[in-house]
Amino acid sequence: MGQMGTRQSLRNLNNTTPTITNPMEEIISPIPREVLKAELTPDKHLRMTNKSNNEVYVVTWQDSPNVVMEIGRLREIAFRAAGGGTGKSYDLDEYDTCDNPYKQLIVWDPEEEEIVGGYRYILGKDWEIGSDGQPNLATSHMFRFSERFMKDYAPWTVELGRSFVTLEYQSTLRGRKGIFALDNLWDGLGAIVVIEPTVRYLFGK
């Protein structure tokens, strides 16, 4: 009877249809274009891109909160499409919104009035160092930085992360605009190296 009861219980479990829940939150609505344009002021403009006539800006949560929210929305869409994503309604974390936040480098399409893609980054000179001598970075859980690295490399290093290209610019839907999306982002990274004389090294995930 014991074996029969066990077999029957297993049959009941096998015949039970599991309840499937969707852990993904609904992504927030797009930030209105006029709100974004109001925050993309000339003082945040870094350069024009070499191709596609797009614009590169550098913003932070403190000076452009709506632009950063839109970045979080677009990141989540792009990462979900690649099988990832945070599952939250937008992809922002404490490194984006803290008192000493990562800067956000974005490519802006002035014709379509939308963000093409972006990176977030923080200069070595701005790293916050803990009592253990380790920097508080998004990659800190992946590495233990040696004393030599912190002394000889960190001051001249930029940590990069959360790179994305907006979904529509990952295809041919935007023609040449889409083809050169990554080139445009690299234009921005190149400009950072030029305007920041301390930068020699780039790393990230």
Give residue ranges: language-model regions.
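Short, well-ordered loop/turn elements at secondary-structure boundaries
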Residues: 99-103, 111, 115-116, 153-155, ...
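Short beta->alpha transition motifs characteristic of CBS
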Residues: 119-126
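Generic detection of long, well-ordered alpha-helical segments
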Residues: 26, 30, 61-72, 179, ...
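A short helix-loop-beta-strand connector motif used in the catalytic cores of GNAT acetyltransferases and
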Residues: 96-106, 129
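Short amphipathic alpha-helix that is part of the acyltransferase structural core
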Residues: 48-93, 104-117
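Conserved N-terminal entry element of GNAT/NAT acetyltransferase domains
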Residues: 20-62
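Acyl-donor binding region in acyl/amide transferases
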Residues: 76, 126-205
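Non-catalytic C-terminal accessory region of glycerolipid acyltransferases
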Residues: 1-23
